């Protein structure tokens, strides 16, 4: 046992000597040397918690080691030794040497619960500026435990660390245009997960270059699913539509002639085919096809080739309609079909915004300069018409050209709004009707009250007369309220009531 302790002390002395030599140098240079035999791991009186496996051996491949020699060190921790293929790492912060085990090769017989793999962490120390390669242990449960130079078995390394793994996730960018893949001052247009390069008008992108070509505008009808949204230009469905149209034109004209197809607008419409399914619809796609400048195709041949390809295939395309190139640029028809958009003459109602633009657009709306009088402003009275100087709403121009306020009941532009007048008339009539109804209600109520008072007076009078008759002493009052009592007399039997109508002599006879 004493012999082992003496050997350990000798090893520590040699380590201190190597450490002093390393501190005098400015940098540590590493070279690759082949290690043929295993090195016995050892530790000083400060124990380091490293995984150990008793009575295990492993074949060790060669690893890069430091230039300073490292003698074998006998472990005093236990009776078993741990063979390690890696050379010991000499620390510049303490007097102990920490052997770090690494992974064994395919012939290793080490237990599966022991060390599995080993990655290399490059750590830089802020104190001495030295860089050391420290192997970090990887347990079987995929937990990383990097080793530092301060005799610690876990925790993050000091300084800047770079971890190198064998598997790298090389996923592409989420935005295809973020790396600016388009050259020659072209624009990168993003779709869903792909993109294409767009050049100036009349040019197409080919081999990282914008080349001049012939422009053939038109419209093509394509069958799409019911859920297709033409506004979602970054959707997968829109990307498929762009790819389908591009493939059609590339197959029709060939790669030597075909340049590029640009989608301008996409509009939805009802399907003209009755045999289509209910969940299908078609869209009208306004496109511009650019062919090589040396092509012999014209507008007629281009239309014929495309429609022929549509009829002969069972694709989702319905038909292709040509748009004249001169109409596309807004120019008058020329003999060369407006091949040079900059040289064509604009139509009468259009103008070129600048000499470098091939398109003729509608003239800008400009108000007359003299429209600065009182109660006047620049207005567009007709849809699509030119602006003109007119009176503001509520005023009307007189014979002298001055703006006068509208008459009562009129308002709006040029005093054509009669709403106020109509409202006044209707309100007046409604007021009269309501007032008449109120008066009639009052009269009716007073009439009912007057009739009720007359009946009460008649009842009072009858009661008064009955009381007056009772005071005379007559017991046989007259019938039906008569003040004269009836007297019964006996009439003679011989005398008969004479009917006045029976005396014909005294009565004139009727003449009928």
From Swiss-Prot:
Q: In which tissues is it expressed?
A: Highly expressed in epithelial tissues, particularly those of the gastrointestinal and respiratory tracts, such as large intestine and trachea, followed by kidney, small intestine, appendix and stomach.
Membrane topology per the record?
A: Single-pass type I membrane protein
Q: May I have one GO cellular component term?
A: cytosol
> Which PROSITE patterns has this protein been placed in?
EGF_2, EGF_3, SEA
The answer to whether keyword Coiled coil applies is: no
Q: What does this protein do?
A: Epithelial and hemopoietic transmembrane mucin that may play a role in cell signaling.
Q: What is this protein called?
A: Mucin-13
């Amino acid at each position: 046992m004493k012999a082992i302790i003496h050997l350990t002390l000798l090893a520590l002395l040699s380590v201190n000597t190597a450490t002093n030599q390393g501190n005098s140098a400015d940098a540590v240079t590493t070279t690759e040397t082949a290690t043929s035999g295993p090195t016995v791991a050892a530790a000083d009186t400060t124990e380091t918690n490293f995984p150990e496996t008793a009575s295990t051996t492993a074949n060790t491949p060669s690893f890069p080691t430091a230039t300073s020699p490292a003698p074998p060190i006998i472990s005093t921790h236990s009776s078993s030794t741990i063979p390690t293929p890696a050379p010991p790492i000499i620390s510049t912060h303490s007097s102990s040497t920490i052997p770090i085990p690494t992974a064994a090769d395919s012939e290793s017989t080490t237990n599966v619960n022991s060390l599995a793999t080993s990655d290399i962490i490059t750590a830089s120390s802020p104190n001495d500026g030295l860089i050391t390669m420290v192997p970090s242990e990887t347990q079987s449960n995929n937990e990383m435990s990097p080793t530092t130079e301060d005799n610690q078995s876990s925790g993050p390394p000091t300084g800047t660390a770079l971890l190198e793994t064998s598997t790298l996730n090389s996923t592409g960018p989420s935005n295809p245009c973020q790396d600016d893949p388009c050259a020659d001052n072209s624009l990168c247009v993003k779709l869903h997960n792909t993109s294409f390069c767009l050049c100036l008008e009349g040019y197409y992108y080919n081999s990282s270059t914008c080349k001049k070509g012939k422009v053939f505008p038109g419209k093509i009808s394509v069958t799409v699913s019911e859920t297709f949204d033409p506004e979602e230009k970054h959707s997968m469905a829109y990307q498929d539509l762009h790819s389908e149209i591009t493939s059609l034109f590339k197959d029709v004209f060939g790669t030597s002639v075909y340049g590029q197809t640009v989608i301008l607008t996409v509009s939805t419409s009802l399907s003209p085919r009755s045999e289509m399914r209910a969940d299908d619809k078609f869209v009208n796609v306004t496109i511009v096809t650019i062919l090589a400048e040396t092509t012999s195709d014209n507008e007629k041949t281009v239309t014929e080739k495309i429609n022929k390809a549509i009829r002969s295939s069972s694709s989702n395309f319905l038909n292709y309609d040509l748009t004249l190139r001169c109409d596309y640029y807004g120019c008058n028809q020329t003999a060369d079909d407006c091949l040079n958009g900059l040289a064509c003459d604009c139509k009468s109602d259009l103008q070129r915004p600048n000499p470098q633009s091939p398109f003729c657009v509608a003239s800008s709306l400009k108000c007359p300069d003299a429209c600065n009088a009182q109660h006047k402003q620049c207005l567009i009275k007709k849809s699509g018409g030119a602006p003109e100087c007119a009176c503001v709403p509520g005023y009307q121009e007189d014979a002298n050209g001055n703006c006068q306020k509208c008459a009562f009941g009129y308002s709006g532009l040029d005093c054509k709004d009669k709403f106020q007048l109509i409202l006044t008339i209707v309100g007046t009539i409604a007021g009269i009707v309501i007032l008449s109804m109120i008066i009639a209600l009052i009269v009716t109520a007073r009439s009912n009250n007057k009739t009720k008072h007359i009946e009460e007076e008649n009842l009072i009078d009858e009661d008064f007369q009955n009381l007056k008759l009772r005071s005379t002493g007559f017991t046989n009052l007259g019938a039906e309220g008569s003040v004269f009592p009836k007297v019964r007399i006996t009439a003679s039997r011989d005398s008969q009531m004479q009917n006045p109508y029976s005396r014909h002599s005294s009565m004139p006879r009727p003449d009928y």
